Amino acid sequence: MGKSVAILGAQWGDEGKGKIVDLLTDRVKYVVRYQGGHNAGHTLIINGEKTVLRLIPSGILRDNVTCLIGNGVVLSPEALMKEMGELEARGINVRDRLKISEACPLILPYHVAMDHAREAALGKNKIGTTGRGIGPAYEDKVARRGLRVSDLFDKEAFAEKLKDILDYYNFQLVHYYKVEPVDFQKTLDDVFAIADVIKGMVADVTTLLHQARKEGVNILFEGAQGTMLDIDHGTYPFVTSSNTTAGGVATGSGFGPRNLDYVLGIIKAYCTRVGSGPFTTELFDEVGAEIARKGNEFGAVTGRPRRCGWFDAVAVRRAVQINSISGFCMTKLDVLDGFEELKICTAYKMPNGEIVEYAPMAAKDWKGVEPIYETMPGWSENTFRVTKREELPQAALDYIKRIEELVGVPVDILSTGPDRVETMILRDPFAA
C-alpha cells in the first residue's frame, strides 16, 4: 500500500523544504505542487551543485519521478519556460516528466505590473510581496475573471478575454497608480509563443493522483512558503495569497483529505521571516546578526535578508493545530553551534498582562506581544554534517527534546547541512 505524505513549512517559510523533498523523492513516483507560484524558492544542493527551483516541483532532479502542478498553483508561463530552459540546459528531462493542471490560473504581465504598483504606493506600509504577480493572480481567480491554462488553447476566445482584463487593469495602472499600461499585442504574442509547449504537458492531475493511490504508489506533496504565511491562518494581512497549510493539499490538487497519511512539518532550529509582519522572537542584536551570517539567511528568490530570532514554540504549536502535523524535520541545527546559551519562546505575554500559549490569529493582536523565554545551555561541539544521532552533543539532544515536549510532536528528521546526504532520518514518513 502506497503512502501519501505532505511536506510543508511550519514557520514563516524558508525552512528548508526543498532539500527534504528532494531527499525523500527516491521513495515516490509523484511529487505535487499544490499552491503558490514562482514566489517559492526551493534550494537544493546535490554533490555540491546548487539548484534553485521556483515553480517546478523539487522531484524533477530524480529521473524516476513525475512532477505535477496542481490547480492551486498560479502559473507564470514565462517563469515556467525560463526554469525549464535552465534545467534542460543541464540535461534534465522536464517535458516528459512534468504534468500541469489545466485549471491553473495564469500569471501574466499585468499581474506583475499591478503587484509592483501597489507595493510602491503603500510605501513603508507595504506587505513585502516578491513582486511576481502572485496576489493579483489569486485575486482574479476569486473574482472569477482570471485566465486559466485551459483558456490558452482557444486563441480567439483568449484574445477577447485578455482584452477585457487588460482594459480593467490598464485603467487602474494609468489613472490611479500613474504608471505605464501593459501592451495587449505583446502580451498576446508572448503567451501564444509558448502555449503549444504548455499544451503538451497538460493533464488531469486529480485523476492521475487517484489512479496512483489505487496502484499503491507513494506520493509526495510539496508545500511552498510556511504556515504562518497562510492567507487564512497566518499573520494577516502580512501573508501570502494561498493556503500554505495541509488543507491546501486537497483544494489545490483534488486529492481527498482522508487519503493523506502523514504530514511532515519543516522547522528551523531557530526562526526567520522575510518581509513585513509580526515576529515576536526577532533579534536585533549581535546574536541575531550572527545567526543570519552563519545560516546564510538571504531569500533564494528575492535575495532579501531574512529577519532572525529564537525558536518560537508558540507559533509552531499553532502550526501543529492547523496541519495535524505527524512529525517534524528540524533543519539548520548546525547554525546554533558555538552559542553559549539558547532561548526558546514558550509563551506570549499580551499587552494586558495575560500569558497565552497559542498565537493570535490577526496581525493587530500581535502588537505589544512579548516573548516569554526558557533559556538552555548551548554547545561548543560541531554538529555540521553529523549524520548519526549518537554523535550529537548532549546539549543539542536536550534542545531538540525540549522543543518536542513544548510542541507535542516528535522530530523525525534532522538536517545538519545543505547537502541531501547531511541528514538523519530517525523515522521515515513513508514507513511511519
Swiss-Prot record:
Gene: purA
UniProt-annotated binding residues for Mg(2+): 14, 41
Cofactor: Mg(2+)
Highest rank taxon of the organism: Bacteria
UniProt GO cellular component terms: cytoplasm
Name listed for the protein in its UniProt record: Adenylosuccinate synthetase
Positions annotated as active site in the UniProt record: 14, 42
EC number, as in UniProt: 6.3.4.4
Enzyme class of the recorded protein, top EC level: ligase
InterPro entries, A to Z: Adenylosuccin_syn_GTP-bd, Adenylosuccin_syn_Lys_AS, Adenylosuccinate_synth_dom1, Adenylosuccinate_synth_dom2, Adenylosuccinate_synth_dom3, Adenylosuccinate_synthetase, P-loop_NTPase
Cofactor remark from the record: Binds 1 Mg(2+) ion per subunit.
Associated pathway: Purine metabolism; AMP biosynthesis via de novo pathway; AMP from IMP: step 1/2
Protein's cellular compartments: Cytoplasm
Pfam families xref list: Adenylsucc_synt (PF00709)
Entry keyword set: Cytoplasm, GTP-binding, Ligase, Magnesium, Metal-binding, Nucleotide-binding, Purine biosynthesis
Enzymatic reactions: IMP + L-aspartate + GTP = N(6)-(1,2-dicarboxyethyl)-AMP + GDP + phosphate + 2 H(+)
Subunit record text: Homodimer.
Annotated residues for binding of IMP: 14-17, 39-42, 130, 144, 225, 240, 304
Task performed by this protein: Plays an important role in the de novo pathway of purine nucleotide biosynthesis. Catalyzes the first committed step in the biosynthesis of AMP from IMP.
Primary location: cytoplasm
